Amino acid sequence: YTTLFRSIVAKNNERIAELEPQITEASEKLLKIKAVKLQPANPFTWASGWKSPIYNDNRKTLSYPVVRSFIKLELARVISEKFENVDAIAGVATGAIPQGALVADALNLPFVYVRSTPKDHGLENLIEGELRPGMKVVVVEDLISTGGSSLKAVEAIRRDGCEVIGMVAAYTYGFPVAEKAFKDAKVPLVTLTNYEAVMEVALRTGYIEEEDVETLNEWRKDPAHWESGK
């Protein structure tokens, strides 16, 4: 299983090979604070409706200053290296609001956040904060699963007349459906780590067992239709 994971990691990370040391470090930090949870017998239900034996709770990183700072600085570095002439940072509500604000502060850039639905009172805003038409925006997410909610935020920013030049996140599950969605939306995506890298580190360090890997492999074959114990 370890050999399999390593081959997948190598393939999936070719486009961001220069981040490989950070991929390993990010994976180790997420596992150390137990941001990755496994419940094969009592699977989680995602917002998409998918059942999953694994859940990544990146909100936990906010409670650990060392991990929080690492993610902030690495996302800021990635944005500085990968995207030019950034005018503003946008966080996707709710998980990416604090991390997005931290990244914007590190880069000394304006920050806004995008709600999933407009407020039902007051100004009824979908985007909180100020964007001006023509601004180049990088969106911050806490993690990427199917990409649906992330790309809704992109659409909202574009409707305001701004240009979304990319998205960054701490983690992605790397589903083909998400990769296709980002490609179709013409949104470059860069993440600090990914499912395969985290699982490789988890197996190597004893965080998961080989029987867990078998369950996860079955889930990965068809996550939209996977059911516990089947």
Residue locations for each model-derived region?
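Short, small-residue-biased leader/transition segments that mark boundaries at the very start
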Residues: 2-4
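The feature captures the hydrophobic core positions of alpha-helical coiled-coils
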Residues: 16-19
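Active-site-facing substrate-recognition patch
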Residues: 22-84
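PRPP-dependent phosphoribosyltransferase catalytic core
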Residues: 22-30, 155-230
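Short glycine-rich phosphate-binding loop at a beta-alpha junction
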Residues: 84-93, 168
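Conserved acidic residues
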Residues: 87, 135, 165
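Short, glycine/charge-rich flexible loops or terminal/linker lids adjacent to PRPP-binding catalytic cores
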Residues: 100-138, 146-152, 205
